[in-house]
Amino acid sequence: MGILSVIRIFIYCLIRLFSFNSRKRNSSIDELERGEINAFACDKQNTPSPNSECRPLTPLNSPFRRTVEGDTANLQAPSPTACPSFDSASSIKSSKEDIACRKLSTERFFYSPNGIDEMKKQQQFKKIPTVSITEVEPAFIPSNMEQALFSEEPFVIQDDLSHQINLDDNRKFSRIQKNKLDPLITVNLVPIVNGENCFNFYETQMETNFLSPEFIKKPSMVDHKRDSEINAVTAVSADGSFSPLTETLSSTISTLSNDSLDGLSSQKNEFTGFNSNSEWIPNDTVDYICNSDASSVVSNLSDFEDCFDQFGVYDKEYEKKIEKTKRNFPKFQSSATYPPFSAHHQARRNNPQGFRNVKKRFQLFKDDCTALTDSDFLDALPFFNARVIIALYVEWRLRVYETMIIKGEESLKNLQRARDGPHNKLWLGVFGNKDTIKKLSNYDRRAISNPYVSNHLNFNVRRVKSDTVYIPTILQLLRSSTQLMTEQAFVASSNLKSTKGLRETRLIQKYKVKGDFEYVYAALYYAAFTQESTLKAVTIDDILSEDELEDWWYLNLRYTSFITPQLCFEFLDKEADSCRDRLTEVKSEPPKAVIYEEPLNKLSRFSSDRLFTSHELVAIAELISLNEPPLESGKKFYYEEFQKACQKKRDDYRYSPEIEFKAAFREKFLQSNEKVPFPRPGEIYEKRCDYFSKYACQNIFISKPLKRSGSIYEVFSDGIGRVIYGSVLDYEATRNNILLHFGFEIHCAPSEEELIEREEAFKDFHNMLSFKYSANEIYEFCGTHSRAEVHKNEVLKRMAYYLIDENKEISILRRILSLRIVEPTTSFTRYEYDLWRTFYPDVLYLNYSKSGRIPTGSPYIMNGQWRKDLCVSTPPMVDINSALFPHWFKLSASNLFAGAEHAGLNRQKPDKIDLDLYEPLPENSYLVAAELRVLRALRHKNPENIPLLEKWEVRALHQLMAKIRKYYTVPTDYLSLRMDGLQAMLRKREYMSCYTFNYFDYACLMDHAYRLYEGFNNQVVNLPPRIM
């Protein structure tokens, strides 16, 4: 029995010993993962209980204390997560969710090939910077921390530092005694002076007393000596400079210089912890700096509702101005340097419900950042400083960009898992066919928009045919891109001298629009500029229209296209300072009148032959012919009237002889009745003796004889032309007469030798339209990609239709319409084209719209442009029979592809073309509208495919929306709503420079594109454009 009892006691001691060690080890590991202790320093001392009731609440012992992350932490936590509650008063009690939230923020995304071991290794060498002592007002400074502030080695925060502070030491360094501290104050906070906590203040019952003088007056300066001592050891943030929200709003100190940090610290000390009666107030709004997350560009968004008004800090440098001019203090009180604008307070009081709605929307910032829209930031302008909204907007774009990256990676993993599964219904349910499975398993490299992936892929093994290309799987792409990003991040961390976050340096290039106009970004910058230059609050109504705002943006491009907003703030500070000087200092001298030259009056220096087009010359002759000139001096009369028209054009560039002729004709012959339709030009020329003077009918407008001999084609063309279009004039003789009367030289027709040379140049032209093509010519049309064979069939089919169409009646009517102009044909010269365009520009325009090709004479034929146009007219699933489709098609293509760069690349031989740089697609082999290509591709894509869009495709869809609104009238509200929905979806992703869509967004995008494509072809294209 004695032996058994000894064994039991021994086992019991072992159990107690192991359980104690494991419990201690688990708690240490948990604290280490939460970032609350260091891996090396775990100095446990005899400290008071953490739950001591008499211990004053300071930011160091706050349950929501978070250390500032360093370089490695930025790599580990590239995206901030949900943070503690918005109510600063409720942030006193901790919860398991908050601890798990902080744990998740450090473990969310850790790009490391070695996993947890690498994480622990980096955790040991992680540099934890010091806490800003000036922000911790009554805290005790330990001796080792005091030494570390003046040494070069990094200071290490010991474990449970907040619990090691003695109550006596804390009372010694504090300005308040224990008996003066009311426990109710720590729960129900009094609003701090100058609106530092006014975000929560408006939900209290003290709204009427906030703007009273006792809250507005300047706080007293207490103990300047101690303030200067503490300011001398101010700890700087991780990147060497403050974030936009924590910077001072001074107009004289640069927001980029480190010199402004001392002023910010001293100004912060003036407002932190004391009211006007020099009594200490527990300010838990100071906690937002200590609780900052270095993985965020805006480092204090944990309690961002306080940061809105904390951004405007009292500026010491304005004390001298106030003392010199007491009368300017009310104006200074409402300026941009005084926190915050009185107009913002007034807007919150006048519209409390709108202020609550904005506040409620911004609460989604941390919970679900994708639920916010760009309009929310514009709605917040009446209530907050525009600079703060810019900083929040930049942070929002960055957060949503990272969120979309995460969703894109998850969708790629799910897609690869579905492709590898045995029940593979994703790829059309094909089983057993090895060739088909091999083709479908190839990953389309054109869908890769990740620069790390595209740089990492080895394209040297690529061959001419796409079926034999080596393309890695999606998991290999993810693995390689992750490793490459990790390697580049480590290289960047070693090269950076400062402790700026890797997340900011790596991603800030992506979400910033470098010079490109973006409406919300430009509107916020314009609001900040207006707010600080006029010293007034800005609302949405004060922002310019989109066209005017775009002009303002590019006019100030050197200020608005920087990488970070601080550079623009520096410019705004200078402008605000100069505007304040102009407002406060009254100058006795009157301003000088600046006379600007009219930029649109360039026609005043033009000669007479450059003022009007050929069609306008005909209109001037018709206008003069309405009145009978003297028979003896007919040419002199026409010349003098023409010089008067030239003077009108020089005086007013908007002068149009066509409009003036129609008005004079309607007044003389139609009794100014607007309801009577205006006669066609052919009708006027047929009855010209009834309308024009006798002199004009005899000496200017010459009739051509009726054609009675020749081929049946020529006779039939002349008759139809007279009946339908009134082509009864001898156009060549009429134009020459007009030029002679106006003092110009006549245009000579081409000689027989020139016509013979031209015919010889095109003797084999029609033979080129046959089906016999060499391999190089087919490659020139279609390229070498996998869809080249399909597109080649479409091109040849269209050529067959073109040959058949020439034998139809419509071909004869086109020839009659345009004086044998049907493109391309050998019976057409530039002389005939210019002659017809002189009298019938609208008819020629309609003919050009129907044909879709440009009849510009020999260069059009010699350069092979007709073949390019023939390929342009063969995009699949496009209504090429609509009347105005080619006109819109040309507008689209000219804006996207200026010149023939893409076509020039396509004209190379297959053995010389560099497929790594350019692989032609059938839709953009020549100057094809990229908008139609994207819409067409979205219409036929399966939503299960990889949802990636290239950047130029998103911009092309934006241009499509703009062109439809600019050139056409959208008839139905349904189509307009579709356009708005598509544009809003694209704009949200283009602002973030992120074009990765999840399944739901991609299906919605495809539905928008399909409906818009159908509605555009059925309703919009067939309407006349506005430019007509």
From Swiss-Prot:
Keywords for this protein: Membrane, Sporulation
Disulphide bridges: none
GO biological process: ascospore-type prospore membrane formation
Topology in the lipid bilayer: Peripheral membrane protein
CC per GO annotation: prospore membrane; prospore membrane leading edge
KW Zinc (keyword) present: no
Subcellular location: Prospore membrane
Regions crossing the membrane: none
Domain of life: Eukaryota
Main location: membrane
Annotated function: Has a role in spore morphogenesis. Involved in the assembly of the forespore membrane.
Protein name: Sporulation-specific protein 3
Organism: Schizosaccharomyces pombe (strain 972 / ATCC 24843) (Fission yeast)
Lineage, opening ranks: Eukaryota, Fungi, Dikarya, Ascomycota, Taphrinomycotina
Gene that produces this protein: spo3
